């Protein structure tokens, strides 16, 4: 049976400077990235050959976007929910891409690692095969997604456990603006 849910969307506006002051701690979050299977295997994930702060400092505004998958039935199977989350991530990316196209000199920030290619070229030591699609996530650039979710959207991050999906999943990203 498919994951039974509905989608809620929320946005919040802040300055890039305020967001950095409150939520960006590159050195704090890098160890979490190092525990992930995408670390050093995707061009969108650390380690980088640049300082992530250069991206944050290149912009003045940030429109945060939360796409919430609210379960309609409690304790649904986690694997089914994760499959739905992957589908929603595609729709989420499409919206952020539209915002980026419509906003000159902006850069979208995605949720989680890039999934545009089945196998990232970084693994083979090659440049990104789709550089026009390469975008970083808030967390890859040292941002505290849980803290930002609580502060701007007044909701905690929930995690599945014991094979059961949480009451909701949230994809958090945004659009950096000049």
Q: Locations of the language-model features?
A:
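Catalytic cores of enzyme domains
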Residues: 3-178
């Amino acid at each position: 049976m498919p994951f039974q849910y509905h989608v809620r969307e929320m946005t919040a506006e802040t300055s890039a400077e305020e967001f950095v002051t409150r939520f960006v701690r590159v050195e704090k979050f890098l160890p979490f990235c190092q525990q992930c299977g995408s670390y050093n295997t995707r061009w969108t994930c650390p380690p980088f050959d640049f300082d992530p702060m250069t991206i944050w400092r290149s912009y003045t505004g940030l429109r945060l976007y939360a796409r919430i998958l609210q379960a309609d039935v409690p304790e649904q199977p986690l694997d089914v929910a994760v499959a739905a989350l992957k589908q929603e991530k595609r729709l989420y990316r499409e919206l952020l891409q539209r915002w980026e196209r419509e906003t000159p000199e902006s850069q979208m920030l995605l949720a989680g690692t890039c999934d545009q290619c089945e196998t990232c070229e970084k693994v083979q030591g090659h440049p990104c095969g789709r550089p026009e699609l390469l975008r970083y996530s808030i967390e890859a650039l040292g941002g505290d997604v849980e803290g930002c979710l609580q502060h701007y959207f007044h909701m905690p991050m929930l995690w599945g456990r014991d094979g059961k999906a949480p009451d909701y999943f949230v994809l958090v990203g945004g659009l950096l603006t000049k």
